[in-house]
Amino acid sequence: MNFEGKLIGKDLKVAIVVSRFNDFITGRLLEGAKDTLIRHDVNEDNIDVAFVPGAFEIPLVAKKLASSGNYDAIITLGCVIRGATSHYDYVCNEVAKGVSKVNDQTNVPVIFGILTTESIEQAVERAGTKAGNKGAEAAVSAIEMANLLKSIKA
């Protein structure tokens, strides 16, 4: 038997956790995610958005939302840009581990839509210019994974 998630958003309930830090980037990721969800027939009333201060806070809120049982998928959006210190490495590693842990603990797909870039230019490229919009890509993954898990449960 093959299992495959369909890209049909009808009847899905999705939460998006988005960092306010680097909001000139994360705002564009959020727009891309919401637009893509709606284009795939997710009802706008079934999209909830939680804003957090920075990327480090994303896993905690994602876990709270996933544990509520109210959502078919959680999308995480943030932007961490390398600076002059090692802070970037710590934040990126811990956020990735945290999001992965939420997937394991809740069995709700939590999609990693957090940009980890070397420069502002790379972030801008991935937020809707040259390299597409990673928020939109995360939304497609959320729809597919939510439907895949539903098909396995059936």
UniProtKB/Swiss-Prot annotation:
Keyword Transferase found: yes
GO cellular component labels: cytosol; riboflavin synthase complex
Entry annotation: catalytic residues: H87
EC numbers, comma separated: 2.5.1.78
Catalytic activity: (2S)-2-hydroxy-3-oxobutyl phosphate + 5-amino-6-(D-ribitylamino)uracil = 6,7-dimethyl-8-(1-D-ribityl)lumazine + phosphate + 2 H2O + H(+)
Keyword list, A-Z: Riboflavin biosynthesis, Transferase
Subunit structure: Forms an icosahedral capsid composed of 60 subunits, arranged as a dodecamer of pentamers.
Organism: Staphylococcus aureus (strain JH9)
SUPFAM superfamilies: Lumazine synthase
GO biological process: riboflavin biosynthetic process
Residues engaged in binding 5-amino-6-(D-ribitylamino)uracil: F21, A55, F56, E57, C79, V80, I81, F112
NCBIfam families to which the protein is assigned, alphabetical: lumazine-synth, PRK00061.1-4
InterPro entries noted in UniProt: LS, LS/RS, LS/RS_sf
Taxonomic superkingdom: Bacteria
Matches recorded under Gene3D superfamilies: Lumazine/riboflavin synthase
Protein name from the UniProt record: 6,7-dimethyl-8-ribityllumazine synthase
Function of the protein: Catalyzes the formation of 6,7-dimethyl-8-ribityllumazine by condensation of 5-amino-6-(D-ribitylamino)uracil with 3,4-dihydroxy-2-butanone 4-phosphate. This is the penultimate step in the biosynthesis of riboflavin.
